[in-house]
Amino acid sequence: MRSKGYRRGTRYLFSQDHRKHGVAHVSKYLEKYEIGDMVDILVNPAMMKGMPHKYYHGRTGRVYDVKPRSLNVALYKRVRGKYVIKKIIVRIEHVRKSRCSEESQKRILMAAEMARDAESRGVVLAPSKRKIEGPRKAVEVSLDNNQPIEVGYEPHVVIF
């Protein structure tokens, strides 16, 4: 029989890096979170309070409520073939701001800047959707210095 403890099977999952053990730094507590922020849940095993279940370690969710020492995070969990929204309460030590939407945020800011420039110049801006790369272009091989080689198979010969 295996025990059904809350932290079972986390010997390596919750292990800290070399010389990174102990309490979280002050900067962790000074980080500001707002409703709508995307956060990565990364369990800090040195802090037992507000620790989420091992299932949520490494998952990304959205903050829907901010408390003085904790966050309420909503994320999707697959349950029997469908995705259910799970709402969990996690202390600040176990989360960090996610970088999952950095690229799209940059693209949005760049598009807004281009729209302002176009408006100031009085030019209509073309749609800035990303284009799919598509297949490679056709290439012609000249036969001047390239002798054609017949490609085929050799019959199987038993040596012994």
Swiss-Prot record:
Keywords: Ribonucleoprotein, Ribosomal protein. It comes from the Eukaryota. One of its GO terms (biological process) is translation. The keyword tRNA processing does not apply. GO terms for cellular component: ribonucleoprotein complex; ribosome. One of its GO terms (molecular function) is structural constituent of ribosome. It holds the Pfam family Ribosomal_L21e. Belongs to the eukaryotic ribosomal protein eL21 family. This is Large ribosomal subunit protein eL21. It comes from Encephalitozoon cuniculi (strain GB-M1).
